[in-house]
């Protein structure tokens, strides 16, 4: 991956991060500015577009997942499965565990209770979706949960030798997306985090297909059909599940 492409992906991360921050902290303010008749019509249009783009931080998350799917596919061109897993573990878990424990200590210091081990252990291992474990870190933990499942899956893809078999891998990702769309939404929650695995996994897969397409590892027609279908699945599911 050349420096120009790395720089572009860094820009995408900055845009994604900015949209997430705007969505969680300033979306109501942007909506108010967009509906304020005292503002110039051009500014109102700009604020409105920004409010829509950052609503719930969803667009930022989509960009993050697209970039992640792309980068992980690139990384696995060179790294073996064991090496890949080891690097992901040491890149994510130490800082994440520190942040979760720090959050618990702060909550305890402010009069809160330390959760039981039945919550702490799945939370620290990022497997809480399988145990109905409440999210930590103000809810942002969910993105790491889905990322870890994606890493496990992609490591297996590498292990069985499909990482460079673009057509087979793309069709596999498409069928997995179709299968996910037919089963019960996962995980079940009462707020924005409802069914995030069901809704956002296709974007990780789209990132994979984009990489395969760029490096001419997949037929472009197969790639286009798969990307359009996976995006359509997201739109149809988000309307059906309606996490907002």
PLM feature segments, named:
Residues 2-12, 47, 51-57, 136, ...:
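Membrane-interface helix-boundary signature
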């Amino acid at each position: 991956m050349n420096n120009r492409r790395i720089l572009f992906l860094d820009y995408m991360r900055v845009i994604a991060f900015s949209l997430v921050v705007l969505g969680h902290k300033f979306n109501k303010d942007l909506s108010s500015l967009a509906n304020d008749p005292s503002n110039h019509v051009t500014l109102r249009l700009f604020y409105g577009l920004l409010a829509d783009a950052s609503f719930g931080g969803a667009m930022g998350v989509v960009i993050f997942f697209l970039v992640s799917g792309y980068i992980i596919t690139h990384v696995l061109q060179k790294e073996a499965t064991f090496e890949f897993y080891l690097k992901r573990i040491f890149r994510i878990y130490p800082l994440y565990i520190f942040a979760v424990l720090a959050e618990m200590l702060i909550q305890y210091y402010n009069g809160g209770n330390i959760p039981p081990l039945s919550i702490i252990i799945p939370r620290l291992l990022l497997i809480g979706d399988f145990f109905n474990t409440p999210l930590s870190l103000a809810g942002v933990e969910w993105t790491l949960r889905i990322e870890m499942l994606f890493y496990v899956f992609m490591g297996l893809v590498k292990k069985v030798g499909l990482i460079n078999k673009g057509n087979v891998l793309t069709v596999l990702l498409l069928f997995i997306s179709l299968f996910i769309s037919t089963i019960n939404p996962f995980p079940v929650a009462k707020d924005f985090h409802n069914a995030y695995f069901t809704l956002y996994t296709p974007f990780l897969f789209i990132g994979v297909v984009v990489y395969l397409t760029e490096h001419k590892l997949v037929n472009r027609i197969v790639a286009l059909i798969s990307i359009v279908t996976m995006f359509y699945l997201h739109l149809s599911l988000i309307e059906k599940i309606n996490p907002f």
